[in-house]
């Protein structure tokens, strides 16, 4: 019976993502934020449950990726699409379809992850959940500036950048703690501390800066490892 617990939690991730899809199409931003946050909790808990219960399975791995594709790939894409359709000039609304690149590259990222055993402790490219977190912050900024042309077009330009980051081979450190000791976890603790500060300062909009910081710290860590 216990072997089904991780997959059940993964299905809750998927369910939360499906609700977020409906809310995104309805323009309910805070509902989307709540559902994506809930999906992230379930995404963490299914892996934790699998480790504690020794309930790993090939099916669980594939199911987890399918759930992540919806919750962290499709949801931010629909949220961005809805906002771009609302705020772009009438003659430019077709540009909103660029948001659909997000789930395509998220699918490529997840497929790549599933066949690459070297990503157990570190990642290659931006994890799909991190992509979703970035877009939560970016969409909040977009809503706050609404008619600001600069923010609109920066959001559009950010799509191919984030898509590239998901599928590139840039080494990204994992946020999984082997222990709570400072040594060996310096970057993780630093990211957590700065993330809390950014959220207090900027609210949900700070999510974009947090993921930007994560990318920068990963680049610095990779360069340090080479030296």
Sequence positions of predicted segments:
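Helix-coil boundary and interhelical linker segments in multi-pass alpha-helical membrane proteins
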Residues: 19-34, 74-100, 138-155, 200-205
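Juxtamembrane membrane-interface segments at transmembrane alpha-helix termini
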Residues: 45-52, 108-114, 168-172, 219-227
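C-terminal membrane-associated helical module and adjoining short loops/tails
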Residues: 123-227
């Amino acid at each position: 019976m216990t072997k089904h617990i991780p997959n059940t939690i993964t299905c809750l991730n998927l369910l939360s993502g499906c609700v977020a899809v409906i809310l995104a199409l309805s323009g309910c931003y805070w509902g989307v934020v709540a559902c994506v946050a809930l999906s992230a909790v379930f995404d963490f808990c299914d892996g934790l449950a699998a480790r504690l219960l020794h309930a790993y399975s090939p099916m669980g791995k594939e199911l987890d990726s399918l759930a992540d594709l919806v919750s962290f790939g499709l949801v931010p894409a629909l949220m961005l699409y809805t906002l771009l359709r609302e705020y772009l000039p009438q003659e430019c609304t077709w540009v909103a379809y660029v948001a659909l690149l997000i789930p395509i590259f998220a699918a490529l990222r997840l497929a790549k992850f599933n066949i690459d055993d070297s990503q157990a402790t570190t990642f290659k490219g931006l994890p799909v959940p991190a992509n979703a977190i970035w877009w939560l912050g970016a969409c909040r900024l977009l809503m706050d500036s609404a008619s600001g042309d600069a923010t609109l077009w920066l959001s559009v330009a950010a799509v191919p950048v984030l898509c590239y980051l998901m599928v590139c081979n840039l080494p990204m450190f994992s946020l999984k703690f082997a222990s709570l000791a400072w040594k060996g976890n310096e970057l993780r603790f630093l990211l957590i501390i700065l993330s809390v500060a950014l959220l207090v300062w900027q609210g949900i909009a700070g999510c974009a800066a947090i993921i930007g910081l994560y990318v920068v710290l990963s680049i610095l860590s990779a360069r340090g490892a080479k030296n």
